């Protein structure tokens, strides 16, 4: 399994201490006046469907509501979907983007500015209302709902931007709805829109997994892994992570990362590359490969160039190899095994020592990974596939759970 999301989650959890007291809906509905409760309970049954296609990205299918193209530019398409409410659902398609977390936040901010301009009032306050994650078929999504106030005093008005994002193949879909209530139908419309982009890629992965990630009881995002073999039997590993973590009542920290690496059939690393975007800024990017019989790393972190040889010049375990070694240890009489891995989120210029051990007496875990001061307890099936795990850091627990597996 990919360890980078675990390190990233820990770093975010330790810096965003307020998350320990939050929940999925951060503001209890009971604290609002009756008119707000009534508005939030609104629903509508949308039976109409419309045909949708976008040939340039091979999208085609039925969308709930009546969809129409409003605007397009190079690599961007903007649609309205009429669902019978005063405000239409707005959907964007991008083929260039920062990621599901950063781009979702940017579109929400754009929508908040648009609401202020439309009403001729300044944005006077905003609050994180809800964050969630899940899957539509095999496609993970993020949810970010934002309660906002415009104006001051007796002129103050309230509203809510509901928003979802999902990445499908080479495009990112984001939908927003500036209406109180209608939460269920908005998700149904978004799901139908996303499903039109879910065509099977030419080189389908032989294994794919999506993990939900939580801090205590707070949904914070997802991690995706895809494994594809080439003609020589080598394995390409594609992994992506998208995280939204509340910093306080008004703001969220955003992280998107993407990795591509190659593994030999025996689980040894060939090479790899990774990048991370934090809060709209490319915070790091690295590549690792063998040069002159040494592992060499090139890249940058916070704009500072990095070029170094690892002190370790031996075998490195790939993410694919971690599955193989887990399955092997489960079958053997041995209690533990040690490896070296390149985990740039922990240290980009070092090979991290990993100890994989069996766990007994714990109904929720049969294995654990020791990474220095951090320990991940997890449950793996006999074939090595990770099902769920937890890492404790003081009062904070980082949970990972498989919510989709294929292969």
Question: PLM features: what roles do these ranges have?
Answer:
Residues 377-381, 385-396:
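Short, exposed beta-strand-loop hairpins at the edges of beta-sheets
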Residues 145-149, 210, 238-245:
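Generic short beta-strand segments
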Residues 1-22:
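Gram-negative bacterial Sec-dependent N-terminal signal peptides
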Residues 22-29, 207:
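Cleaved targeting-peptide boundary
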Residues 83-124, 188-189, 201-212, 218-220, ...:
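Solvent-exposed helix/loop surface patches that form functional interfaces
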Residues 38-77, 219-299, 384:
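N-terminal mature ectodomain segment of secretory-pathway/periplasmic proteins
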Residues 70-160, 166-177:
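Conserved polar/disulfide-associated segments of primarily extracytoplasmic proteins
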Residues 57, 169-205, 401-407:
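Surface-exposed amphipathic alpha-helical segments
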């Amino acid at each position: 399994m990919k360890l980078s999301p675990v390190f990233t989650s820990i770093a975010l959890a330790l810096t965003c201490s307020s998350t320990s007291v939050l929940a999925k809906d951060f503001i209890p509905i009971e604290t609002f006046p009756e008119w707000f409760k009534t508005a939030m309970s609104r629903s509508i049954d949308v039976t109409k469907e419309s045909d949708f296609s976008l040939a340039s990205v091979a999208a085609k299918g039925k969308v709930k509501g009546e969809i129409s193209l409003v605007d397009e530019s190079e690599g961007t398409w903007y649609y309205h979907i009429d669902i019978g409410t005063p405000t239409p659902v707005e959907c964007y398609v991008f083929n260039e983007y920062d990621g599901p977390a950063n781009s979702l936040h940017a579109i929400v901010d754009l929508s908040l500015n648009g609401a202020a301009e439309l009403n001729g009032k300044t944005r006077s306050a905003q609050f994180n209302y809800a964050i969630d994650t899940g899957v539509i078929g095999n496609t993970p999504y993020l949810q970010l709902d934002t309660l906002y106030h415009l104006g001051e005093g007796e002129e103050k008005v309230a509203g809510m931007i509901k928003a979802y994002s999902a990445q499908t193949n080479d495009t990112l879909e984001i939908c927003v709805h500036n209406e109180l209530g209608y939460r269920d139908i908005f998700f149904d419309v978004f799901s139908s829109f996303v499903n039109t982009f879910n065509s099977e890629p030419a080189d389908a992965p032989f294994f794919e997994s999506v993990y939900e990630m939580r801090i205590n009881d707070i949904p914070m995002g997802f991690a995706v892994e895809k494994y594809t073999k080439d003609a020589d039997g080598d394995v390409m590993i594609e992994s992506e992570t998208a995280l939204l973590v509340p910093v306080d009542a008004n703001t969220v920290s955003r992280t998107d990362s993407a990795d591509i690496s190659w593994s030999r059939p025996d689980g040894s690393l060939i090479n790899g590359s990774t990048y991370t975007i934090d809060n709209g800024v490319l915070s790091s990017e690295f590549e690792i490969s063998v040069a002159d019989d040494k592992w060499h790393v090139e890249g940058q972190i916070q704009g500072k160039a990095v070029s170094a040889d690892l002190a370790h010049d031996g075998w490195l375990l790939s993410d694919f190899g971690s599955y193989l070694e887990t399955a092997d240890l489960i079958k053997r009489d041995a209690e533990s095994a040690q490896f070296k891995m390149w985990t740039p989120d922990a240290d980009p210029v070092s090979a991290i020592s990993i100890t994989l051990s069996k766990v007994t007496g714990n109904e929720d875990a049969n294995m654990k990974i020791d990474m220095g001061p951090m320990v991940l307890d997890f449950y793996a099936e006999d074939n090595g596939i990770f099902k769920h795990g937890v890492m404790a850091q003081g009062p904070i627990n980082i949970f990972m759970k498989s919510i989709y597996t294929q292969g």
